[in-house]
């Protein structure tokens, strides 16, 4: 992952089609076009896992069914705890077969429609529910040496709580960090960088002009009419965090993608 930072390789978020879509063929074409654009430009395609708790096709499943090419260090699959054990292994086996080595392991957004891994499924004792910590530990045990796994860091949670969770995540096998989205320099992220100087850190940049949507991530209301320029903010993030990678969430492929070749110099 440090290779991505040193070579200024953006992580670009791609959402797979929702299973409830009424235009599956069109959505699959959109997914393919975005994936190929990212791959051919040498960046890393980061494919979400039931984002916002909405049931979607799985990233590795889409890649395999569509016959898309995989470059091992240019794909990262998000993986959360809202799966059956059988489905979890299907995903991991598919990633292994395709040569996908990067996983972002998160607890995830749940809903009543989604199954949830149980402690017994992952051999976890003395816990009431499975979090990213138990999932990391399980994958490391069942697939030793196969995957390089990252975890989320939320600078909007109480710092003591978040740093304790991060400590447990690294003990379970995490090797890199991706933050929640920021739009300005963040003191908690600065503290995290001081605590983990040798760990690759990827800063998530919010690329949607709908700044009000970010309220759900940061935990406080951001008025929709707040002035916000995603590209200018991205450039500032690079200035504030020159030794970190950047994950582009909700990137506009038509209007913004052509611009990012000039934002990381």
Q: What are these regions, as identified by a protein language model?
A:
Residues 8-16, 43-47, 75-79, 103-105, ...:
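Hydrophobic faces of well-ordered beta-strands that scaffold small-molecule active sites
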Residues 198-245:
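Catalytic-face loop-and-helix region of soluble metabolic enzyme cores
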Residues 8-29, 74-86, 148-161, 217-228:
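Active-site mouth loops of central-metabolism enzymes
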Residues 53-66, 83-90, 109-139, 159-161, ...:
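Active-site-adjacent beta->alpha loops and helix N-cap segments on the catalytic face
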Residues 2-6, 32-40, 60-72, 92-100, ...:
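Acidic (Asp/Glu)-rich catalytic clusters
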Residues 8-10, 235-265:
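C-terminal extensions of enzymes
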Residues 30-48, 169-178:
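Catalytic domains of carbohydrate-active enzymes, especially glycoside hydrolases
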Residues 102-163, 167, 172, 197-213:
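Conserved anion-binding
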